[in-house]
Amino acid sequence: MSPPLDSALEPLSEYKETAFPRTEKDPSQYKEHDLVTPEKEIQTGYFSPRGSHSSHGSHDSSASSNISLDDARMSDVNNSPNVFHDDPDTIDEKLSMYWKAANETVIREPYDYIAGIPGKEIRRKLLEAFNHWYKVDEQSCQAIATTVGMAHNASLLIDDIQDSSKLRRGVPCAHEVFGIAQTINSANYVYFLAQNQLFRLRSWPQAISVFNEEMVNLHRGQGMELFWRDNLLPPSMDDYLQMIANKTGGLFRMIVRLLQTSSRQVIDVEQLVDVLGLYFQILDDYKNIREEKMAAQKGFFEDLTEGKFSFPICHAIGEGAKNRTALLHMLRLKTDDMKIKQEAVCILDNAGSLDYTREVLYGLDRKARSLLREFKTPNPFMEALLDAMLSSLQACH
């Protein structure tokens, strides 16, 4: 058996070359015609309320046939006041002219329901910790925090539907309350609202690119996890770790890369982000089996009920556990039966998979702290975050 930490980190060595792609230009190097700025979006009519162009009077039908759509749009703009005034909030103000607050409440309700329930706040703490080094201003930090928080909570709405989950943070999942269709629409809607927050940043062209890239990675990771589950195809440990790098690591990288777009500090944190992403997700997999608090909030060994290949399960199957076939059958059942779940835990125990997972987690904790010591500037926020994760691991029975 290979050393736990080495086997956990090795699959990411090639991935790290593309995890933090470098932007070719900073915003100051873009020429004006290269960018479609929010001001230009307003000018070309993309954000104009329905019917707003008709208010400027009718055009001669014979002349209009020779006028391009862009010319028509610009004609309207030239005869109307500048509504943007360099303030992104104006976009929302224009949209609100024909969109009622009551309607907004209705379509956001599934999202607001889950967002209003306190979570781990790991992403907010990560942003605070990394910004200790990047020193991004408070207003930009708030925009980044809002973007990542909205994207994360919206992804949970979709996650719970795809996993047929019943509980989230100790309460019924949003789709159990509002229905599947409305919850899907609310989640997708909030993805775009999250992206719109980035227009508040001076570096918004880079920030939008980062957001899109990491949302693509998130969906790649989620897609592979669903494929393995629905086809009962056990992934290799390498494939599983790559999935984590995309799904969980995607939002972690989004935080750091968005901070980088707004910072003058040049600090290489790639390896630390990789380790934290692995640490967080594998710890979550372990707690799903071993932590009483998570059992109360989501249900004991909910990963088995969802038919999900978690880190301990992947290890047991990969090691050729004596009852490998029985474990696969239990995953296929997607059962809530406590006796079956307890039998599955016994299989993992006998295969040494829970001990292995715990050993990997302690190794990741040591690795993260070793990397932290290499930075010139001490980071008490990152130390506190690691301490909290270690305490959570130690609390598992």
From Swiss-Prot:
Isopentenyl diphosphate binds at residues 120, 123, 152, 169. Induction: Expression is positively regulated by the cluster-specific transcription factor pbcR. Its cofactor is Mg(2+). GO terms for biological process: alcohol biosynthetic process; isoprenoid biosynthetic process; mycotoxin biosynthetic process; terpenoid biosynthetic process. Residues 1-67 are annotated as: Disordered. SUPFAM superfamilies: Terpenoid synthases. Pathway: Secondary metabolite biosynthesis; terpenoid biosynthesis. Residues 13-42 have a biased composition (Basic and acidic residues). Mg(2+) 3 binds at residue 284. The record marks 191 as: Important for determining product chain length. Residues 52-67 have a biased composition (Low complexity). Keywords: Isoprene biosynthesis, Magnesium, Metal-binding, Transferase. Its EC number is 2.5.1.-, 2.5.1.1, 2.5.1.29, 2.5.1.10. It holds the Pfam family polyprenyl_synt. Mg(2+) 1 binds at residues 159, 163. Binds 3 Mg(2+) ions per subunit. Mg(2+) 2 binds at residues 159, 163. It catalyses: isopentenyl diphosphate + dimethylallyl diphosphate = (2E)-geranyl diphosphate + diphosphate; isopentenyl diphosphate + (2E)-geranyl diphosphate = (2E,6E)-farnesyl diphosphate + diphosphate; isopentenyl diphosphate + (2E,6E)-farnesyl diphosphate = (2E,6E,10E)-geranylgeranyl diphosphate + diphosphate. PANTHER family: GERANYLGERANYL PYROPHOSPHATE SYNTHASE. Geranylgeranyl pyrophosphate synthase; part of the gene cluster that mediates the biosynthesis of the diterpene ent-pimara-8(14),15-diene (PD). Within the cluster, the HMG-CoA reductase AN1593 functions in the mevalonate pathway, which produces isoprenoid precursors. The geranylgeranyl pyrophosphate (GGPP) synthase AN1592 is needed in the formation of GGPP, the precursor for diterpenes. Lastly, the pimaradiene synthase pbcA performs the 2 cyclization steps that convert GGPP to ent-pimara-8(14),15-diene. Belongs to the FPP/GGPP synthase family. This is Geranylgeranyl pyrophosphate synthase AN1592. The lineage of its organism: Eukaryota, Fungi, Dikarya, Ascomycota, Pezizomycotina.
